[in-house]
Amino acid sequence: MARIAGVDLPREKRVEVGLTYIYGIGRPKANEILVKTGVNPDTRVRDLTDDEVNKIREIIDKEYKVEGDLRREIALNIKRLTEIGCYRGRRHRMGLPVRGQRTKTNARTRKGPSKPVSGKKK
């Protein structure tokens, strides 16, 4: 089983898809990596040679932030925004949408489940 960036890639999938199991690598980056290493995207992960796996691992380690490093950088960016007290930081702290979306209706993903408001008493 190919292990790249601390992630076991699924053996039965194509390399192009298998690389997307690594946090921070989607289809476009996976294709870019395969072009740089000269590996055919249609190859199955189980059919990769050790040399090809090492090439892929080398490119990812050198040129991309993935897994823990990427998660840490994102967390630090959010922490920095909250500490300086800018608008985006306040929105993160309050658990509201950060990028200007409306909140009168919708925004349930960020706000959590709706809190029922009791109707008018008779």
From Swiss-Prot:
Residues 101-122 have a biased composition (Basic residues). The keyword tRNA-binding applies. Residues 92-122 are annotated as: Disordered. GO terms for molecular function: rRNA binding; structural constituent of ribosome; tRNA binding. It comes from the Bacteria. Keywords: Ribonucleoprotein, Ribosomal protein, RNA-binding, rRNA-binding, tRNA-binding. GO terms for cellular component: cytosol; small ribosomal subunit. GO terms for biological process: translation. InterPro entries: Rbsml_uS13_C (IPR027437), Ribosomal_uS13 (IPR001892), Ribosomal_uS13-like_H2TH (IPR010979), Ribosomal_uS13_bac-type (IPR019980), Ribosomal_uS13_CS (IPR018269). Belongs to the universal ribosomal protein uS13 family. Located at the top of the head of the 30S subunit, it contacts several helices of the 16S rRNA. In the 70S ribosome it contacts the 23S rRNA (bridge B1a) and protein L5 of the 50S subunit (bridge B1b), connecting the 2 subunits; these bridges are implicated in subunit movement. Contacts the tRNAs in the A and P-sites. Part of the 30S ribosomal subunit. Forms a loose heterodimer with protein S19. Forms two bridges to the 50S subunit in the 70S ribosome. This is Small ribosomal subunit protein uS13. The gene is rpsM.
